[in-house]
Amino acid sequence: KLMNRCVIASSFGKSFHITGWKIGYAVAPDHLMKEIKKVHQYNVFSVNSVAQACLSEYINHIDVTQLGQFYKQKRDLFAQQLSKSRFQLEVCEGTYFQVADYSAISSASDVDFCKSLTTNHGVAAIPISVFNSDLKDAKKIRFCFAKDDNTLIQAAKILCGI
C-alpha cells in the first residue's frame, strides 16, 4: 500500500559530484507521475540539455553500489580529522552530512556561528535550527563531507584551530 503512495525526489548532485549541474529526478507510481508531470512542466523553464547528455553517458560508467562505501570513507576521514577538535560529532549514517555540536566553542546562535565560520575561517556549515519548525537552536550545525579529501582535511585543520 505504501509503495503506491510514495514519491522519491532526489538529485544527482552530491552523489556524482555535480552539484552545480542542478539535475534531479523523481520516481513514483505511474498514476502519481502523471500528476507530477502536469505541475513539473510549468515549474522548470530551462533545462541544461548538454549536462543531461553528459550525465546519461557518465551514469553508465559509475557503480552506484559503491557510493555508500565511498561516502563512508569520506565521513570517517572527516571525523578522524576532527577528533582533536572541540566539536562533538553526532553519529551519521546514510548521509553526506556530519552534524556537530559546537557548544564547547561558542554560545553564539547556530546561524551566527555559521556566518562566523564562513566569514572568519572560510569553512561553510549550515545551522540546524533552520530545519526546525520552531527554529529551536540546539547549538548544532552540519557540514557536508561530499568533498574531495584535500578539502576535507584542510577544513578540519581550520576547525581544529577554533
Language model features by range: what are they?
Residues S10, F97-D101, C144-F145:
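Short beta-strand segments
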Residues S116-A125, F131-I162:
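PLP-dependent enzyme catalytic core of the Aspartate aminotransferase-like
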Residues F12-G13, F87, I128-N132:
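Short, solvent-exposed loop/turn elements at beta->coil junctions and helix N-caps
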Residues C6, F87, V123:
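Short, conserved active-site loop motifs that form the nucleotide-linked donor/cofactor pocket
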Residues Q52, S56, Y71-A79, L89-Y102, ...:
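Conserved glycine-rich beta-strand-loop-beta hairpin in the small C-terminal domain of fold type I
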Residues P29-D30, N60, D101-S103, A146-D148:
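Residue-level recognition of strand-loop junctions within catalytic nucleotide-signaling folds
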Residues L2-K72, D76-Q81, I162:
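Conserved core segment of the aminotransferase class I/II
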